[in-house]
Amino acid sequence: FIVLVICLSCLISFFLWNQNRAKGKLPPGPTPLPIIGNILQINTKNVSKSLSKLAENYGPVFTVYFGMKPTVVLYGYEAVKEALIDRSEEFSGRGHFPLLDWTIQGLGIVFSNGEKWKQTRRFSLTVLRNMGMGKKTVEDRIQEEALYLVEALKKTNASPCDPTFLLGCAPCNVICSIIFQNRFEYDDKDFLTLLEYFHENLLISSTSWIQLYNAFPLLIHYLPGSHHVLFKNIANQFKFISEKIKEHEESLNFSNPRDFIDYFLIKIEKEKHNKQSEFTMDNLIITIWDVFSAGTETTSTTLRYGLLVLLKHPDVTAKVQEEIHRVVGRHRSPCMQDRSCMPYTDAVVHEIQRYIDLVPNNLPHSVTQDIKFREYLIPKGTTILTSLTSVLHDEKGFPNPDQFDPGHFLDENGSFKKSDYFMAFSAGKRVCVGEGLARMELFLLLTNILQHFTLKPLVDPKDIDTTPIANGLGATPPSYKLCFVPV
């Protein structure tokens, strides 16, 4: 007991010293308690809402303590733009994320830093660009998968169904075709297991328990909890990816790379004599996991949430279908060239992403050097939270931001109107590496669904609730059922 008291006293003393040292440098914020910081002032079920209230008191730049470490929060378009776009290099670091630091070990694209991040990201973008111009382009793969999805939806026979599973299959298979060269049947056992891991991981990551884990990783890591399920899921995903890599190694043709794995294996071979090379087998595994994690569950959740919003707004859905049938017709599949002739549909796809606000607080950034931001001094390595909610729901960019209105992206002539406030994929040097892919998937999959089906709700549209059931790392829509009635 005495040892425990001494340890706690040391921690409190260190905390107070550290806090005093930072006074006059970091932005203002609520007074943190020793050890636990401001965790009692943060609603871990809806961090975004708590940050909104704090911004009312402390302005667009303030400091909160998740545990003992300070986090600088940037709230509103002006502050977020100044950091991520105007000063993108200084804010390009990836912030501390204890939940995944344990397993990722600083590898891959999403959670890496420095030269490892720059080289891996640059290489991955180049490969995706090359595949976009190949014999079988990324658009071809999405269109092919859209047809499989339509056939699967037809098999529901217009009966009530939960769309979660089927809307997860299509984006996951698109990633599979890019990474592994082949897609899976929707009843494939390995495929179903992989899908379940991604879905469960996102649900776990959005819980209050995980917010506490990130604040107190050393304390909670050894306690029972859902984080152990997540670690187990990730380990099984790594095993699945490793097996696919082994299969590729056995059939690799250096002069004819088939997919992302082949390109990466060739790069590893070319740099095998460079001991400082960032292209290793471990980095390949984590990079693939990053691409899957970022490209599967986010897109499928957006589709699932999008259909729920469209059920709530049948008038909007009817206008989209009219435009699809007028521009595309019924006898061919929509393609990306059609988008420029379909401003209303394009606006609806953008408004869905803005309205649902899928990643409310972005992934954490960090500053790569000591900087002066406005009148504050922010030390190198400080974690930065950029509130995407505050940008996507900014009244200056989107009048009546809490209303679902495709008019947010249309001008007075009905033409599509871009908005600098649209940061659904973040912005700057850490903008989502799969943004181009996700934009194609959302447009092509949604238009294919609405080309072939009328969405029939099981309740009156007025009674449909679109409020997320969880709002941690990601916004999770409530579960629902609908009928896909063939047109």
UniProtKB/Swiss-Prot annotation:
Gene from which the chain derives: CYP2C21
Name of the molecule in the record: Cytochrome P450 2C21
Function comment: Cytochromes P450 are a group of heme-thiolate monooxygenases. In liver microsomes, this enzyme is involved in an NADPH-dependent electron transport pathway. It oxidizes a variety of structurally unrelated compounds, including steroids, fatty acids, and xenobiotics. Showed testosterone hydrolase activity.
Keywords, comma-separated and alphabetical: Endoplasmic reticulum, Heme, Iron, Membrane, Metal-binding, Microsome, Monooxygenase, Oxidoreductase
Matching CDD domains: CYP2C-like (cd20665)
Family the entry assigns: Belongs to the cytochrome P450 family.
Tissues/organs with expression: Liver.
One function term, GO molecular function aspect: oxidoreductase activity, acting on paired donors, with incorporation or reduction of molecular oxygen, reduced flavin or flavoprotein as one donor, and incorporation of one atom of oxygen
Catalytic activity: an organic molecule + reduced [NADPH--hemoprotein reductase] + O2 = an alcohol + oxidized [NADPH--hemoprotein reductase] + H2O + H(+)
Chain coiled-coil ranges: none
EC number: 1.14.14.1
Required cofactor(s): heme
Major localisation: endoplasmic reticulum
Pfam families with a match to the protein in the record: p450
